[in-house]
């Protein structure tokens, strides 16, 4: 008798993806973040759905509706803070996942990697639009500043910005469309994530050594299901510690002031997970140049396979590249810190140096280190 798990048209797909999937025997905890991202996405969709039941996307009532959710809706406060802090956990997992891919050379799976970059952009767009919805001061001014960047595009810029706004400023039309997009995008992300997995399962997973995984495979269940459950428990623990003890730790106090177009906050800054890109944007005195640098800071990931000069896939046995990788991590943390600081001395010059270092490391220094390591192998 055939097993239903293996014969049923729908169960067969799930079985081949999560149960009988051959997985490398030596993948470390850095390979847990894929499943954690899936959990984050499901959590965000569920909490977001319940928030949408009580939220009103209208400039006059949006701020009040969020206050109403926190005060009057049963467990509304926990749903709201799980959603807000869930976004932070999502980005922590995302950056860890991308960093793992860079360190272990996973970008050589071209289709998987490129879908991943598209996913990153989609999640960033979703998070940005979600931040606008509570209609606090930072929501309004963040939306104004970031959408205004598109006006730097020659010839069509101004028309494009007004088209996105649905008027001559960020107003009711903007809020309504941002809510619509914020609702639909996570489902598009879920579909893209399935394509991401589809392409990954065509090749199988990479492993820390960077050599072929085919020599030693084990079934995904029970080995990696139990490992993923442990990861999930730690993720939920971290999220709930944040939500229940310091729910506003990562937020901006300005967002507890209702949006006021006549009063500009002294320091306009996005959520912490965009600060590194914001620092790169601000470090260039030219508007168009800043916008290009901002986009390229993420789009540069597409070039990773082209910039791979090493004869080895992973950085596991490449000390020079490892050193540069961790300098890049430190550099990104520096940019994150600078993005949250006011535009004044010495932060301006630190931001400019960190921005130059960021592009220099990825485009020049890391490929050069790879080539030096290749020559060392000849001995």
Curated annotation (Swiss-Prot):
Subcellular localization, as worded in the UniProt entry: Mitochondrion inner membrane
Keyword terms of this UniProt record: Electron transport, Heme, Iron, Membrane, Metal-binding, Mitochondrion, Mitochondrion inner membrane, Respiratory chain, Transmembrane, Transmembrane helix, Transport, Ubiquinone
SUPFAM superfamilies referenced in this protein's UniProt entry, alphabetically: a domain/subunit of cytochrome bc1 complex (Ubiquinol-cytochrome c reductase), Transmembrane di-heme cytochromes
Membrane topology recorded in Swiss-Prot or TrEMBL: Multi-pass membrane protein
GO cellular component, one term: respiratory chain complex III
Major place of residence: mitochondrion
Cofactor binding annotation: Binds 2 heme b groups non-covalently.
Subunit structure: The cytochrome bc1 complex contains 11 subunits: 3 respiratory subunits (MT-CYB, CYC1 and UQCRFS1), 2 core proteins (UQCRC1 and UQCRC2) and 6 low-molecular weight proteins (UQCRH/QCR6, UQCRB/QCR7, UQCRQ/QCR8, UQCR10/QCR9, UQCR11/QCR10 and a cleavage product of UQCRFS1). This cytochrome bc1 complex then forms a dimer.
Additional free-text comment from the UniProt record: Heme 1 (or BL or b562) is low-potential and absorbs at about 562 nm, and heme 2 (or BH or b566) is high-potential and absorbs at about 566 nm.
Function per UniProt: Component of the ubiquinol-cytochrome c reductase complex (complex III or cytochrome b-c1 complex) that is part of the mitochondrial respiratory chain. The b-c1 complex mediates electron transfer from ubiquinol to cytochrome c. Contributes to the generation of a proton gradient across the mitochondrial membrane that is then used for ATP synthesis.
Stated name of the protein: Cytochrome b
